[in-house]
Amino acid sequence: LHSLGMVDLQSGVCRKDELPEVLAGLNGEFIHSRGRSTELQLRYPDALSDPGNIVVTRLDTRIVSALVIKRFTWRVPPLDLRAAMIGMVWTHPTMRGKGLARTTLTHAQSMMATEKLDFAVLWTSQPHVYSSLGWVSADLGCYAAGPGKPASQPATEAWPEGFDRMLCIRERLSP
């Protein structure tokens, strides 16, 4: 029995036979509900062609939550930092508000800790939901053309407070 009162709630890596169900949920949420047409597996084939990149939470035999992990190496000579980007966090619409995305993310965090990754980036529009799991906002801004306007105040330092944590990783791993 899970603390949510649901029998047989399990998180783990997506199985190959579950991939169509997961893709249907992700595409429904992030593509079709927004009036888009190019499905995620065509936009992100490297991440979504391997079920090993997808973490799911199952209730009995049904997928109720999922997220995608894209592992990468961040080269900061002389270092090669092992890292991951996490995105496409999804919970079935009828199951929202029960902590299932948190359950899925907690399992993903355990997996990444076992892999001894140096850091991970969580892409979310709701950072407050995940702060209790140890995630901190480290948004460095947007790199894109945009409408310009005069600054309302003098320029300030570009790095947020959390960037010091990233520098600590670099110092710890430097030879």
Feature map (PLM): residue ranges:
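Amide-forming acyltransferase catalytic core, primarily the GNAT-like/NAT-type
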Residues: 136-175
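A conserved beta-strand-loop-helix scaffold within acyl/acetyltransferase catalytic domains
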Residues: 11-89, 173-175
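Conserved active-site alpha-helix within GNAT-family acetyltransferase domains
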Residues: 114-119, 124-144
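Conserved acetyl-CoA-binding loop-helix of GNAT-fold acetyltransferases
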Residues: 88-91, 97-112
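Extreme N-terminal starter segment of soluble prokaryotic enzymes
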Residues: 7-9
